[in-house]
């Protein structure tokens, strides 16, 4: 694995390049929301690689609320993200655990919705998401966390598609923070394509 770029800006630029090359596609697609789009972003090729996880962990950790004790997100897209951020926090000597929110309660054992070390009721949790379109996945995670007694006021995403997700999250009293907008990733993909 190559070492991280020396500055935060270089790290951010490298992450944008990785997303543009490995996560972004142009064509005709049906999104998880059911919407049709000419742009598709699948962050998993980046978020499931060691070097991508390292970049994402550092980039996302910067936007986790200072008093948050956990990061959480809906399985599957958020699974590597919460782990990467918890690891980056540990390396920065910050205690921050990871929780995975199931799409439905476990059908056996404890019938749990949440996996991971559960903090006490009332604890602040920051929700992580790979891509926000309508905000539906984030809202499902937030609903489960709030029903369990946790304080959730912020969602941090890698890419905001700017298709109503921020407005839906704001309506649920959530702040959306994004590393990149879809147009930034698409533009970088075009730039990289013309360079080759």
From Swiss-Prot:
Entry GO MF terms: magnesium ion binding; orotate phosphoribosyltransferase activity
InterPro entries: OPRT, Or_phspho_trans_dom, PRibTrfase_dom, PRTase-like
GO biological process, one term: pyrimidine nucleobase biosynthetic process
Pathway(s) served: Pyrimidine metabolism; UMP biosynthesis via de novo pathway; UMP from orotate: step 1/2
Functional note: Catalyzes the transfer of a ribosyl phosphate group from 5-phosphoribose 1-diphosphate to orotate, leading to the formation of orotidine monophosphate (OMP).
Assembly behavior: Homodimer.
Protein name as annotated: Orotate phosphoribosyltransferase
Origin organism lineage: Bacteria, Bacillati, Cyanobacteriota, Cyanophyceae, Synechococcales
Gene: pyrE
């Amino acid at each position: 694995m190559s070492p991280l770029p020396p500055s935060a800006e270089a790290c951010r630029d490298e992450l944008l390049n990785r997303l543009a090359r490995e996560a972004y596609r142009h064509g005709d697609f049906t999104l998880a929301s059911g919407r049709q789009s000419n742009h598709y972003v699948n962050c998993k090729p980046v978020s499931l690689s060691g070097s991508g996880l390292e970049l994402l962990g550092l980039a996302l950790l910067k936007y986790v609320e200072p008093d948050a004790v956990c990061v959480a997100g809906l399985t599957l897209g958020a699974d590597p993200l919460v782990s990467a951020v918890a690891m980056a926090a540990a390396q920065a000597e910050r205690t921050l655990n990871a929780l995975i929110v199931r799409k439905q309660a476990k059908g056996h054992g404890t019938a749990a919705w949440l996996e991971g070390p559960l903090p006490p009721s009332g604890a602040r949790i920051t929700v992580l998401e790979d891509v926000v379109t309508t905000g539906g996945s984030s809202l499902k995670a937030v609903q489960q966390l709030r029903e369990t007694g946790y304080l959730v006021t912020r969602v941090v995403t890698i890419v905001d598609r700017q298709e109503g997700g921020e407005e839906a999250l704001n309506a649920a009293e959530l702040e959306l923070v994004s590393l990149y907008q879809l147009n930034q990733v698409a533009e970088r993909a075009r730039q990289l394509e013309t360079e080759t």
